[in-house]
């Protein structure tokens, strides 16, 4: 089994189907006795240019360890799923389990925002 990193860009207008789609791919990976080392939901993000008349996409990142047969099956499924705007499959030498910089920055921004709100609330209470 080899290590892969997969980035999926899914049509954000299919909100209800997004997690059903992801669950299908998780089942497929487990059916081939694969391992999901990291799964991240990056949420909706703006695209640099329109793709299939869309300006945003819902992004997901997966680091998995699977057989080449499973990757072929996943890639075939990605190609024929009309809800998937784009996909990238990269071969990796080892499993990546750390939080990605994109998600890390998102969490740090939330913490900064929360601390700012707390400071503002404290200042309002003092007055």
From Swiss-Prot:
A molecular-function term among this protein's GO annotations: structural constituent of ribosome
InterPro entries from the UniProt entry: Ribosomal_bS6, Ribosomal_bS6_sf, Ribosomal_S6_plastid/chlpt, Transl_elong_EF1B/ribsomal_bS6
Keywords: Ribonucleoprotein, Ribosomal protein, RNA-binding, rRNA-binding
Keyword check for Thylakoid: no
Coiled-coil ranges (or none): none
Function description: Binds together with bS18 to 16S ribosomal RNA.
Family statement: Belongs to the bacterial ribosomal protein bS6 family.
Protein name: Small ribosomal subunit protein bS6
Organism: Buchnera aphidicola subsp. Cinara cedri (strain Cc)
Origin organism lineage: Bacteria, Pseudomonadati, Pseudomonadota, Gammaproteobacteria, Enterobacterales
Gene behind this protein: rpsF
């Amino acid at each position: 089994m080899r290590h892969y990193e997969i980035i999926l860009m899914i049509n954000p207008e299919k909100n209800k189907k997004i997690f059903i789609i992801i669950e299908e791919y998780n089942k497929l990976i487990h059916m081939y006795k694969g391992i999901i080392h990291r799964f991240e939901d990056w949420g909706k993000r703006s695209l640099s240019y329109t793709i299939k008349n869309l300006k945003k996409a819902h992004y997901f990142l997966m680091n998995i360890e699977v057989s080449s047969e499973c990757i072929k099956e996943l890639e075939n499924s990605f190609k024929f799923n009309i809800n998937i705007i784009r996909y990238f499959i990269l071969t990796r030498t080892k499993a990546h389990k750390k939080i990605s910089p994109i998600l890390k920055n998102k969490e740090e921004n939330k913490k900064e925002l929360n601390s700012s709100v707390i400071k503002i609330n404290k200042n309002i209470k003092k007055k």
